[in-house]
From Swiss-Prot:
Higher taxonomy: Bacteria, Pseudomonadati, Pseudomonadota, Betaproteobacteria, Burkholderiales
Family matches, as Pfam families: Ribosomal_L29
Designated name of the protein: Large ribosomal subunit protein uL29
GO terms under cellular component: cytosolic large ribosomal subunit
Source organism of this protein record: Cupriavidus metallidurans (strain ATCC 43123 / DSM 2839 / NBRC 102507 / CH34) (Ralstonia metallidurans)
Keywords recorded for this protein, A-Z: Ribonucleoprotein, Ribosomal protein
Length: 64
């Protein structure tokens, strides 16, 4: 997911995306804890995506 794609969305869409990413992160953490996670790089990707969404939300809030 690119920041340029995120900037095209409105705040409600970004909040929904953030909620989905947080659920995915929780799920991945639980899989890691129970040693069921095969691809651990997914954790890093989701964490970076969460940061991107939060950054764009902050940019939109400060622009007002």
């Amino acid at each position: 997911m690119k920041a340029s794609e995120l900037r095209g969305k409105d705040a409600a869409g970004l909040n929904q995306e953030l909620s989905e990413l947080l659920k995915a992160q929780f799920s991945l953490r639980m899989q890691k804890a129970t040693q069921q996670l095969q691809n651990t790089s997914q954790l890093k990707k989701v964490r970076k995506d969460i940061a991107r969404v939060q950054t764009v939300l902050t940019e939109k809030a400060n622009a007002k």
